[in-house]
């Protein structure tokens, strides 16, 4: 019964395994091998989180990454199935550029960025990654950019204008 509830709770999130690496710790007696997993989860409706887990076995590393990702969930304000406006983000040497796309465009993004867009619920976006292609840094840069995205309501409140005035300048 408890396993069934746990499985039901897990299924509410979309999960993407982005990378699995074999890592080594050199000690006096030789090398100790372990595995590191990078995972992105989301609900497909604007929530996304990432996690990084290390263990001696791959499944354990993935489970640790999933648990960490569930603790790091953030909410993204989407505009239907795309972004609110063009944004950039960076983390380390990774720089990401994203802009909304018209309906039917699809996800034009590569590598780790595509996994983030899949699980967050973005269906139409144009994105480019420059600098390092390190999956961990690209995911962090993408999520940093998405969380900094402002809704028209936030912009209107900040400027002391109505939402209609803000949206009239966009079109």
From Swiss-Prot:
Record-level Gene Ontology MF annotations: rRNA binding; structural constituent of ribosome
GO biological process: translation
Keywords: Ribonucleoprotein, Ribosomal protein, RNA-binding, rRNA-binding
Coiled coil: none
Domain S5 DRBM intervals: 13-76
GO cellular component: small ribosomal subunit
Cited InterPro entries: Ribosomal_Su5_D2-typ_SF, Ribosomal_uS5, Ribosomal_uS5_bac-type, Ribosomal_uS5_C, Ribosomal_uS5_N, Ribosomal_uS5_N_CS, Ribsml_uS5_D2-typ_fold_subgr
Superkingdom classification of source: Bacteria
Domain statement: The N-terminal domain interacts with the head of the 30S subunit; the C-terminal domain interacts with the body and contacts protein S4. The interaction surface between S4 and S5 is involved in control of translational fidelity.
Quaternary structure note: Part of the 30S ribosomal subunit. Contacts proteins S4 and S8.
Record-stated family: Belongs to the universal ribosomal protein uS5 family.
PANTHER family found in the cross-reference section: MITOCHONDRIAL RIBOSOMAL PROTEIN S5
Function comment: With S4 and S12 plays an important role in translational accuracy. Located at the back of the 30S subunit body where it stabilizes the conformation of the head with respect to the body.
Name of the protein in its database record: Small ribosomal subunit protein uS5
């Amino acid at each position: 019964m408890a396993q069934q509830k746990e499985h039901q709770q897990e299924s509410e999130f979309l999960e993407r395994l982005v990378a699995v690496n074999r890592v080594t710790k050199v000690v006096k007696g030789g090398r100790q091998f372990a595995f590191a997993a990078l995972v992105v989860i989301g609900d497909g409706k604007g929530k996304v989180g990432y996690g990084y887990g290390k263990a001696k076995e791959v499944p354990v590393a993935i489970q640790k990454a999933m648990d960490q990702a569930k603790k790091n969930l953030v909410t993204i304000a989407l505009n239907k199935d795309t972004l609110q406006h063009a944004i950039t983000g960076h983390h380390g040497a990774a720089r990401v550029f994203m802009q909304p796309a018209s309906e039917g465009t699809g996800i034009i993004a590569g590598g780790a960025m595509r996994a983030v867009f899949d699980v967050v619920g973005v269906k139409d976006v144009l994105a480019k990654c420059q600098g390092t292609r390190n999956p961990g840094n690209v995911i962090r840069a993408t999520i940093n950019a998405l969380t900094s995205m402002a809704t028209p309501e936030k912009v209107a409140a900040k400027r002391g204008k109505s939402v209609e005035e803000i949206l009239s300048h966009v079109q």
